[in-house]
A protein has these predicted regions:
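Conserved PLP-enzyme active-site core in the AAT-like
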Residues: 1-116
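Non-catalytic terminal extensions of PLP-dependent enzymes
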Residues: 100-105, 110-244
Length: 244
């Protein structure tokens, strides 16, 4: 699964790509960082795989009415990266590096960088990802995510209890990153509070009352939330993306 790794094939000083690491097959989501339309992706085949056999297997399950719009967007994006990929992702890295430095200069935020690489718990770092710790501002990452979306018209990728992730890709410009930095500065000025008010991030060991397989195949019914006390939820509840 190389959903977030399209740029590894074109960028310089990037983490090793799945195919370079020896994968037989890699699913690459071009729409995430390669510029194609949402839902479009490639399946890359390594030298040990019979491409015609892979195609035959895929034809057993996929629709015979594929979206030509998605396929054309894949081909256009593929050509664009083949001709200009290194230049494009060099610019993406420059933009992300600029934003990371500006955010860290604001105070209270921490935009993660390659300084975390230690050869052990952190093996490598994707410099195109702009991950920002928000706890010292006294705000959870999901709170900053919501504020950016609702009041600054900036949609980021993800927010959790302590972090915010901005996905910088082929479509971003310098002014987009400047807007993000300015918005974070304004959020710090207007909303900063004592981080002691944040919810404590304690791990609560869950009580397993049904395994995933049992829950999936069990009979289910839809109920209003107020009537579900004491019942077992048959769906997954998780931070998303990535939903793993």
């Amino acid at each position: 699964d190389e959903a977030h790794g399209t740029h590894f094939y074109f960028g310089e000083n990037m983490p090793v790509s799945a195919m370079a690491a020896g994968a037989d097959l890699a699913s690459v989501s071009m729409h995430k960082s390669g510029g194609s339309l949402t839902q479009s992706s490639f399946l890359l085949c390594g030298p040990s795989m019979n491409a015609e056999h892979v195609r035959q297997i895929i034809n057993l399950t996929q629709t015979t009415s594929g979206s030509y719009l998605l396929m054309v967007s894949l081909d256009i994006s593929r050509k664009n990266l083949a001709l200009h990929g290194k230049e494009i992702f060099r610019k993406v890295v420059d933009l992300t590096t600029y934003a990371r430095e500006e955010i860290n200069a604001l105070g209270d935020y921490y935009a993660y960088g390659s300084e975390l690489i230690n050869g052990d718990t952190v093996y490598d770092f994707d410099t195109t990802k702009l991950a920002v710790n928000t706890l010292d501002v006294g705000l959870a990452g999901i709170e900053v995510y919501d504020i950016l979306r609702d009041f600054y018209d900036i949609q980021t990728e993800f927010g959790d209890l302590g972090n915010l992730l901005a996905y910088v890709s082929v479509g971003d410009r310098e002014r987009d990153l400047e807007r993000l930095v300015a918005a974070l500065a304004d959020i710090r000025r207007r909303y900063k509070r004592d981080k002691a008010t944040l919810m404590r991030q304690e791990y609560i060991s869950p009580q397993v009352v049904a395994g995933p397989q049992e829950a999936f195949y069990a009979p289910k019914k839809s109920l209003p939330l107020r009537e579900t006390e004491g019942m077992v939820c048959s769906e997954f509840v998780m931070c998303y993306p990535p939903g793993i």
